[in-house]
Amino acid sequence: MGKGCKVVVCGMASVGKTAILEQLLYGSHTVGAETSDTQEDIYVASVETDRGVREQLRLYDTRGLREGLDLPKHFFSVADGFVLVYSVDCLESFKKVEVLKKEIDRSRDKKEVMVMVLGNKCELRERRQVDQDTAQQWARGEKVKLWEVTVTDRSTLIEPFTSLTSRLTQPQSKSAFPLPGRKSKGTPSNDI
């Protein structure tokens, strides 16, 4: 198991961030159960990657964002990845995800941080406010992976987190240091 990755889970209040994590990790979330506001929690998960290796994931469950309340700035510097969550039955929550993605891009280099988006409550078809095609088009433009999920079906939660963990823990393919006997780009050659 590697060093572990820090992943910040964020989005508006009541989109189901805590429900997603509790259902994913414990299979214990009851839809409709009364919940209290999350202040901030950390969950530790051991996730099997698509390479068959178990990796540790530290999931930072953040307080739901409301009008005038932003994601605390320290999360931008400590996170290896972000999971942005919206509810398909709340257009405002999707717009907040768009804003969060811009904030992440402003504070971090796109190549150094992994972002994925979850559209939660996809079973609420009759109350849908966020069009799936529109959301996917936005995600493609932002170069992020988007999944629609529901806590009523735990299997919809497993693939996104397995994929995220696999991408965060990919072995480096190239050494940052040149190997003896090989020419590296930008190094003058003595060949004539």
From Swiss-Prot:
Sorted UniProt keywords: Cytoplasm, GTP-binding, Nucleotide-binding
Residues at which GTP binds: 11-18, 61-65, 120-123
PROSITE patterns named among the record's database cross-references: RAB
An MF annotation (GO) of this entry: GTP binding
InterPro entries (alphabetical): KBRS (IPR042227), P-loop_NTPase (IPR027417), Small_GTP-bd (IPR005225), Small_GTPase (IPR001806)
Subcellular location: Cytoplasm
Gene3D superfamilies the UniProt entry points to: P-loop containing nucleotide triphosphate hydrolases (3.40.50.300)
Recorded GO CC terms: cytoplasm
Signal peptide: none
Short name of one Pfam family: Ras
Region (Small GTPase-like): 1-192
Region of interest (Disordered), residue spans: 169-192
Span(s) of short sequence motif Effector region: 35-43
Any single GO BP term: Ral protein signal transduction
Domain characteristics, as noted in the entry: In contrast to other members of the Ras family, the members of the KappaB-Ras subfamily do not contain the conserved Gly and Gln residues in positions 13 and 65, which are replaced by Ala and Leu residues, respectively, and are therefore similar to the constitutively active forms of oncogenic forms of Ras. This suggests that members of this family are clearly different from other small GTPases proteins.
The family this protein is said to belong to: Belongs to the small GTPase superfamily. Ras family. KappaB-Ras subfamily.
Function: Atypical Ras-like protein that acts as a potent regulator of NF-kappa-B activity by preventing the degradation of NF-kappa-B inhibitor beta (NFKBIB) by most signals, explaining why NFKBIB is more resistant to degradation.
NCBIfam families cross-referenced by the UniProt entry: small_GTP
The protein's name: NF-kappa-B inhibitor-interacting Ras-like protein 1
Organism: Danio rerio (Zebrafish)
Gene this protein is translated from: nkiras1
